[in-house]
Amino acid sequence: MDLQSMPQKPAEAFPLIAALDLGSNSFHLCLAKANIHGEVRILERLGEKVQLAAGLDEERNLSEEATQRGLDCLRRFAQFISGMPQGSVRVVATNALREARNRSDFIRRAEEVLGHPVEVISGREEARLIYLGVANSMPDSGGRRLVSDIGGGSTEFIIGQGFESELRESLQMGCVSYTQRYFRDGKITPARYAQAYTAARLELMGIENSLRRLGWQQAVGASGTIRAVALAIKAGGHGNGEISPDGLAWLKRKVLKLGDVEKLDLEGIKPDRRTIFPAGLAILEAIFDALELEQMVHSEGALREGVLYDLVGRHQHEDVRERTISSLMQRYHVDPEQASRVEAKALKVLAEVGDAWELNDELHRDLLSWGARVHEIGLDIAHYHYHKHGAYLIEHSDLAGFSRQDQQMLSLLVRGHRRNIPADKLAEFAAEGDKLVRLCIVLRFAILFHHIRGTQEMPSVRLKAEPKSLSVTFPEGWLEANPLTQADFAQEAEWLKRVGYSLNVR
């Protein structure tokens, strides 16, 4: 987890912070400076069209050609972030890598190029970050905002107020994927356009009612497709930069009349966006019609700006992941006193064995702390196999602030806190798998130590960690006088043997 570590250092202490957005259509880099008030000043913006989503085959494998396009772009970006310390750069990947079955190969190679971890984020986490970027880039309208962001492989919808998002959705429709499906040869016909529009309307049917129930006072569009539409409509004399149904209708007629992406020489549409513009326009028209929008304004802020503000928040002790963990505890009625006891003991043990077991990264501490607090959420489902229920809830929930990998690791930590440690699944994390086994052992020790749930004062113990063993020394005579704890640790020694560790208790 060396790449995943994040120093405990305020963002304003870094000369620069950076956000990389590995999108399905384009890769973007933002370099910025943060001040002590949490404000972010953008110093440099870079973007390259990569069209990663176009490289996905029918089996959802990313082609080597698309992989090389992405890596070549990242090599150029790497020059800008060379030497920047861990924790000052955050790299997020979206729909194309969410979908790619061979994403681990791309991620490994990308991390070698960048020297920083790549996080594949869920659609709803992407939506949360988009809203954060929009909210920090526009004046507060005083009411609810509906934010829409048409990406290369997915489209996100968020309703929020102020800086807080209330509803987040992500749909599998994007300007690159729809181009591949409906406009592959560049020809724009009314029939093809209608197919793309209808497909988007069908996707929207699943979320229309939930969006309408919450309501909004202002509709905002983010990212390149909506920006290009707004600029083209303004250049055509149909408004002052806002998007309206009339403006959309005019632009649609214009695009259909031209009939080919090579002829889309319209002001506001960059040459490298022409091929994907008709698909994006069809999706946007479907959004307007489905939600009966009268107007949409464009925001310059989007995902990468949201990543920067989220990065600043993490360093200023406003980590949204902490709120997510607290929400899980409340939703699933976790006993807060027991969770606190287990967390305190687990972190104390980590401090004692961290050097010997190479568990010194901040992420190790975070995972252990979170795991201790939510390890019992499965009890709200049933006691039988509650560790499996808890792991399932964590793996399959939308956890704001968590990357997919962090979420999977937390799920496995909860799964492994009792009975069998899922060594086969932990091994999927390659070199980090053994460290996750060690984190499981630390958490299991803390839980065993407080098996009696605070009804008895527990003694101080001495710990000694070696590469494949943990020795625990209780005060003389204490174990004999407490046979339940003695039996617990004897059984634990048997479980740990199955993953190649010995537990020596005396």
UniProtKB/Swiss-Prot annotation:
It is found in: Cell membrane. GO terms for cellular component: plasma membrane. InterPro entries: ATPase_NBD, Exopolyphosphatase, GppA/Ppx_hydrolase, Ppx_GppA_C, Ppx_GppA_N, PyroPPase_GppA_Ppx. This is Exopolyphosphatase. PANTHER family: EXOPOLYPHOSPHATASE. The keyword Metal-binding does not apply. Coiled coil: none annotated. It holds the Pfam family Ppx-GppA_III. It is a peripheral membrane protein.
